[in-house]
Curated annotation (Swiss-Prot):
GO terms for biological process: amino acid biosynthetic process; aromatic amino acid family biosynthetic process; chorismate biosynthetic process. This is 3-phosphoshikimate 1-carboxyvinyltransferase. Belongs to the EPSP synthase family. Its EC number is 2.5.1.19. NCBIfam families: aroA. GO terms for cellular component: cytoplasm. Phosphoenolpyruvate binds at K23, G97, R125, Q172, R346, R388, K413. Keywords: Amino-acid biosynthesis, Aromatic amino acid biosynthesis, Cytoplasm, Transferase. Monomer. GO terms for molecular function: 3-phosphoshikimate 1-carboxyvinyltransferase activity.
Amino acid sequence: MQDSLTLNPIARVDGTLNLPGSKSVSNRALLLAAQANGTTRLTNLLDSDDVRHMLTALGQLGVNYRLSADRRSCEIDGLGGPLRADEALTLFLGNAGTAMRPLAAALCLQAQDVTLTGEPRMKERPIGHLVDALRQGGAQIDYLEHEHYPPLRLRGGYQGGDITVDGSVSSQFLTALLMMAPLAPQNSCIRIKGELVSRPYIDITLALMKSFGIEVRHDNYQVFYLTGGSVYRSPGEYLVEGDASSASYFLAAAAIRGGTVRVTGIGRHSVQGDIRFADVLESMGATIRWGNDYIECSRASLHTIDMDMNHIPDAAMTIATTALFASGGTTTLRNIANWRVKETDRLTAMATELRKVGATVIEGEDYLTVTPSARLSAARIGTYNDHRMAMCFALVALSDTPVTILDPQCTHKTFPDFFARLSALSTPASPHSAP
């Protein structure tokens, strides 16, 4: 296994990149297809650790699927109803929140004991608000180690009814409830307590459910109404959009060291909120062009911003490293407390690693300020087993300074060939070229 990867200075990035499938869309689509009536063919499926964990779990639960040799398309024979285990079993889900949370809800509709567990970091990622909500609907759930955290033992029992869920930590809790509730015996009315974070991810969920035949009524995202005893219906074919979070690194690279980069597989009508990252780059000075199936970014002089980033929590990390190249002082990212419950505590991790390359950083409870130095320092960047840390800090090589990424394999969670794709668009700086 490769312990580290040193990226030498990059003079220019240019070209077109066809994005890998979206992680958020891939795992939602797999779960809905598995429970739908009929066979679904998913294309442009993401091949990554998170998706492999979901596929393995579905296979253990008796779902039949046929995966293409390149793992980018998959035919799933739907069960025509809720997931079910024939006997007690344990599902290992790695650090895949997009598998853990929805499966925890989905498996409350069947009677066998099912244990959900994962990597050590998964056992540090809170799930208590989801468990509380499921218990309100009758689910029997036990914590096997620490209260409010995986591993969990699920023993069915969810009926429906009036449910209140805290929306302030993770939108994945609401996503999990929304996707399972139509299959419950009774109607569900789901009320949101607190501010709903990452609302665009709920839009992804609602769009996917609609593609599988179920429309959800809601009162301005505060109360959701779901009819129990419903059936998901396969759309036959479903094209997984390119991953908008993954697009952010290449669009930012173009803004810093373009040329022009075009990312294809997403566009102006994407269901993913992270396409709004392009608007943030534009507000920093970059030139953005939109098509139905692409977003294009060209280099411009970048300046600082002060902005609420709650709507694009994953892509906002890319803004933190893009800020190293912005003129005019300090960039401030606000309302990002949910960074702390991701693959690592991303606020602390980002602050720590930005300081290594010479930035002055203030880490607040829910905000980050970044003031770049005149010249970046060469550094060895810790990645905390977090794919997005590795990909964000690759942008440091767009300076006249090399950067070393520790544990580069962590990108396999969502983008296994990220570094090869970046290299293919890059022109290396010659040893004597100006920055």
